[in-house]
Amino acid sequence: MSFTVKDIYDKFEVILVILDGEEKMDRVIEKPGLSRPTFELFGPFQSDPIKSAVVLGNREYSYLTSLSPEERKEKTKRLLELQPPVLILTKSFLDPVFLKECNKEYKVPILCTDMYSNELNISIGLYISKQLAKYTIHHGVLIEVYGEGVLIIGESGIGKSEVAMEMLRKNFLFVADDAISIARIGDRLIGRPTEINKHFIEVRGIGILNVTKMYGIEKIKSSAHISIVVELINIQNNQPYNFERTGQKTRYKVIENIKVPHYVLPISSGRRSSELIESAVIDLKLKRDWQYNSGDDFVERYYKYMTKEE
């Protein structure tokens, strides 16, 4: 399904005002993010159509208003001739009158906002990138624990969905089960359910359950930034594996060309998987946000003790 200028306006109607080109709001946006018309205004003529939403801010306004009326008209028409799907004017673009005058021939949708360029990138730019991102399907369960997206993976039947149910009872958030749509957006991984499995989870022996009906809509998250991968391994199969002992070194798993911290947890009777996952998330936050490594702390204390004994 095509992603149009109207989709942006409908999503951000509170902060956007249609200035011109309302009859062309069905124009399709094909490229993610927001672009600035550097070459189109400042450089040699570009002949390729612009396929992304274009932002005009203080830089563009200062340049255009520094030109003579004839040059300003020429440069503005050069941009409009490339038929960008939409122009979004920031708070810094003070006077759009000449832009509207040139646009009579081209009918490019022009939206204005009371926000600055960096604010638009965070809100509208990120929204466009999410909508146009290429998602691939990965097998697992995605939940959010302490604000961190946790992708739980492991062989079929190991208990990933059961762990997710335990986490729900602990008031953590559910994103998706079984088929996870994952896309790279900038340097982040975003995971979400597919249209088919949204809000559903499969628990062996019970069947398909509707998480929203059972626990309430407040336990559902539409998507999550994947911060950590937790892999469950059944050690009862007697498969050799070099498990982490001190936790000094962080393992990583590469998903969509992004390295994600990877914790491998052995599963056996008597071990509460949900509590282990909580501990893994807390350990991640300590290492990443506080630069504290429990393993390093322990080893340092151990060597100090041994040196003292000698």
Curated annotation (Swiss-Prot):
EC supergroup of this enzyme: transferase
GO biological process, one term: regulation of carbohydrate metabolic process
Binding-site list for Mg(2+): 161, 202
Disulfide bonds: none
Residue ranges of the region described as Important for the catalytic mechanism of dephosphorylation: 266-271
Catalysed transformations (reactions): [HPr protein]-L-serine + ATP = [HPr protein]-O-phospho-L-serine + ADP + H(+); [HPr protein]-O-phospho-L-serine + phosphate + H(+) = [HPr protein]-L-serine + diphosphate
Domain remark text: The Walker A ATP-binding motif also binds Pi and PPi.
Entry-linked HAMAP family: HPr_kinase (MF_01249)
Function, in words: Catalyzes the ATP- as well as the pyrophosphate-dependent phosphorylation of a specific serine residue in HPr, a phosphocarrier protein of the phosphoenolpyruvate-dependent sugar phosphotransferase system (PTS). HprK/P also catalyzes the pyrophosphate-producing, inorganic phosphate-dependent dephosphorylation (phosphorolysis) of seryl-phosphorylated HPr (P-Ser-HPr).
Name recorded for this polypeptide: HPr kinase/phosphorylase
Gene that encodes the chain: hprK
